[in-house]
């Protein structure tokens, strides 16, 4: 995962009052943090906007990831963390050309 994406996501979670472990190269850590803090993040995502800086692809991906997280929360996290990670990784690979 691109370091700037990990940094933006970590800052967003931190702004929501959530400390998360980012020791994996996929998005498992993110979806575990979201699931473990679903009520807190629901409120945060409904009341804030998050401006990203950087290149267009990074901004596009981070905002798309935020939309995916919001939808997942709206569906009470019924899909597994693994399914959500696979979705995020698939889109990440397509956008950034990573195998």
Question: Which ranges hold each PLM region?
Answer:
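Alpha-helical bundle regulatory/interaction domains
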Residues: 1-99
């Amino acid at each position: 995962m691109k370091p700037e994406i990990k940094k933006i996501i970590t800052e967003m979670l931190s702004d929501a009052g959530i400390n998360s472990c980012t020791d994996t190269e996929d998005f498992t850590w993110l979806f575990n943090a979201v699931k473990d803090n679903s009520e807190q993040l629901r409120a945060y995502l409904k009341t804030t906007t998050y401006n990203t800086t950087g290149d267009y692809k990074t901004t596009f991906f981070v905002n798309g990831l935020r939309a995916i997280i919001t939808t997942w929360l709206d569906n009470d996290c019924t899909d597994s963390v693994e399914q959500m990670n696979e979705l995020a990784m698939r889109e990440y690979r397509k956008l950034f050309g990573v195998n």
